A protein has these predicted regions:
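Extended, hydrophobic beta-loop-alpha segments that form or line the acyl/peptidyl-thioester binding
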Residues: 220, 232-235
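Catalytic cores of RNA-modifying enzymes
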Residues: 1-222, 228, 245-253
Length: 254
């Protein structure tokens, strides 16, 4: 199977499986090899690493991750993409695809099973409609994470870096800056995706620095300028609330 990081190979796979994009899942697949390589390089992946990929799509970035890491766990919510992933990733024996909602996946259990409980690295082209719950959940849950390298809406990436007292400072800014050192590693125009999103994107990297999930974070929140309102009213740029996932809680009954 050829690498998918270009329009030609991506279109061939989509046509082969007669795949239709679903807007409800915020699907925009990367088709630029340069951006893919920048993301992989920024993640600092080694052959000792376990990678959690959220939303692998057709496996474009997953292929690159499999080439670089010891183990890749790819969590995909869209059932229609599973047979495609089985095809595009068939040459790799170091990848496991899980068909589930990432907010309901027990990441601690995965880290324990596939990485002996050691910290993992998260790499993802995140669906923009659910960016905040995923990021907040990753940082605020007791998930063993070494670093995150993710693609997000540019406006959201910019918000992660603003300081207290600015109008865009909110719960996401506070959490990211408390738990990691945020850095934008690439600004990505819409033409690097298929289909093209209506907004610009940025690849964001952050090495996790804080490990105290309790009193220290509460104290930091209370002392931050404007934190009381920030924690209760996150910006709605990505179209979601600031509720984070539990990453291991029981699924709600149907």
């Amino acid at each position: 199977m050829a690498f998918l990081g270009n329009p030609k190979n991506t279109i061939e796979v989509l046509q082969k499986y007669n795949f239709n994009f679903q807007k409800k899942f915020g699907q925009n697949f990367l088709i630029d090899t340069n951006i893919l390589e920048e993301i992989i390089d920024s993640a600092g992946i080694t052959k000792d690493d376990m990678i959690l990929e959220i939303g692998p799509g057709i496996g474009t970035m997953t292929q690159y991750l499999c080439e670089s890491a010891r183990q890749v766990i790819a969590v995909e919510i869209d059932t229609n993409l599973i047979p495609i992933l089985e095809d595009t990733l068939s040459e790799y024996d170091n990848v496991k695809v899980i068909n589930d909602d990432i907010l309901k996946v027990d990441i601690n259990a995965l880290a324990e099973e596939y990485n002996n409980g050691k910290p993992i690295k998260v790499v993802a082209n995140l669906p923009y409609y659910i960016t905040t719950p995923i990021i907040m959940g990753l940082f605020e849950s007791h998930v063993p994470i070494d670093s995150i390298t993710i693609m997000v809406q540019k406006e959201v990436a910019d918000r992660m870096q603003v300081g207290p007292g600015t109008k865009d400072y909110g719960a996401l800014s506070l959490a990211v800056q408390y738990y990691a050192k945020p850095e934008i590693v690439a600004n990505v125009p819409p033409n690097c995706f298929m289909p093209r999103p209506n907004v610009g994107s940025s690849a964001f990297a952050g090495e996790k620095t804080a490990t105290d999930y309790g009193a220290a974070y509460t104290s930091y929140s209370a002392g931050a300028s404007g934190s009381a309102s920030a924690l209760g009213s996150e910006s709605k740029t990505d179209g979601v609330t600031n509720e984070s996932g539990d990453f291991g809680g029981q699924p709600e009954p149907d």
